[in-house]
Design a protein with these regions (language model features):
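Alpha-helical transmembrane segments and immediately membrane-proximal extracytoplasmic
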Residues: 1-359
Length: 359
């Protein structure tokens, strides 16, 4: 059965709506620390965040999208594809309306929890309790619980390391800190993108190539930083940590796009598949690029157009952040989110960054 194109248009609109409100509501996850610490203006931060959110969506968006489309509800037993289409559209619209309300109230809200709940509700109504993949549901819920604690612990560890290093400030120490953290950010991103299976050969290949690429890029940027580093030790310290804060904020934006784009792209992918093929492939291993792109653009536009409304809540009202503590919070949050994204788990970026700031 091939559905009418009007369902595709309505589904695309609903997915774009969720993506747009997602960007407006969760922009603070990426730039709240930078704005709260006074490192960057809101306007400039929003544009950078929109760009890296889109990049994260394009490179990593398929992993969580597949989970939302097929991992929660056993949709293969539904004979009428139109039921799946209506269910996905309903889940998108209900999530979008709830997010509009929370955004108007300036309350940071987890869209992942909202869309998972909506899809779960659709599944319970259409296929019943027995056709819900409860092991995956509990795995997702468990990640919502442990993610903030992981962010807190990582943030505390990094802060203690940072405190020891800056207790005896020197140019060499600042350059080492810069090199180590940029290498970590690059390695994590490249490795998670390259690794395809858990086989030793695949992991070794991804690990080796990631090490080579990340260290090479980091060393090149370190040479550039060394050339432009201010001679005054205090200015040098501020310059290094401002640079690291910028990189970590963009890593957080990248992670946000990678995970949260699925909240729109996953349901939309199901609608696109049914429109084009009349069914959702049983051996689904990919998500249509159009679903990822439309959702990614929606998030970016939401960030640019309305993201300023909740930035102050995360950046300034939770705690007073310095440039250095802001960097630690963003680095911790982005690292944990990117890892669980690669595992295909829809998580709350809001909870992760709040946990990191708390730590």
């Amino acid at each position: 059965m091939v559905i009418d194109y009007m369902f595709l248009i309505v589904g695309g609109f609903a997915a774009f709506l969720v993506a747009w409100v997602n960007g407006a509501n969760n922009a603070a996850n990426a730039i709240g620390s930078a704005v709260g610490s006074g490192m960057m203006s809101i306007r400039k931060a929003l544009w950078f965040t929109a760009l890296f959110d889109l990049l994260g969506a394009l490179f990593f968006g398929k992993f969580v999208s597949i989970t939302l489309l097929r991992g929660i509800v056993n949709i293969s037993i539904i004979d009428d594809p139109l039921i799946v289409v209506i269910g996905m559209i309903t889940a998108l619209f209900s999530t979008g309306l709830w997010l509009i309300i929370t955004t108007l109230l300036k309350i940071p809200m987890s869209i992942s929890q909202a869309i998972v709940g909506a899809i779960l509700g659709f599944g319970l109504v259409t296929v019943g309790f027995s056709q819900i993949n409860w092991s995956k549901v509990f795995e997702i819920i468990a990640s919502w619980i442990y993610l903030p604690f992981v962010s807190i612990v990582l943030s505390i560890i990094l802060y203690r390391i940072h405190s020891r290093i800056v207790s005896k400030p020197s140019y060499l120490r600042f350059i080492i800190v810069y090199n180590v953290f940029t290498t970590c950010i690059l390695f994590t991103t490249i490795f998670l993108l390259l690794v395809k299976t858990t086989r030793i050969t695949d992991v070794f290949y991804a690990f080796t190539l990631s090490i080579i690429i990340s260290i090479s890029i980091s060393l090149l940027s370190t040479v550039i930083i060394h050339r432009i580093l201010p001679k005054n030790i205090d200015y040098a310290r501020e310059f290094v940590f401002k640079t690291l804060l910028f990189f970590s904020c963009m890593a957080m934006a990248f992670s946000h796009g990678a995970n949260d784009v699925a909240n729109s792209a996953g349901p939309l992918a199901g609608i696109i598949y049914i429109y084009e093929q009349g069914r959702i492939p049983g051996d689904l291993v990919d998500i249509p690029f159009t679903a990822i792109l439309l959702s990614g653009i929606g998030i970016s536009l939401g960030i640019i157009m309305w993201g300023y409304r909740v930035v102050e809540t995360i950046g300034e009202k939770i705690t007073t952040l310095t440039i250095e503590t802001g960097f630690i919070a963003q680095f911790s949050g982005s690292l944990t989110i990117l890892i669980v994204t690669r595992l295909g788990l829809p998580v709350s970026t809001t909870v992760a960054i709040v946990g990191a700031i708390t730590g």
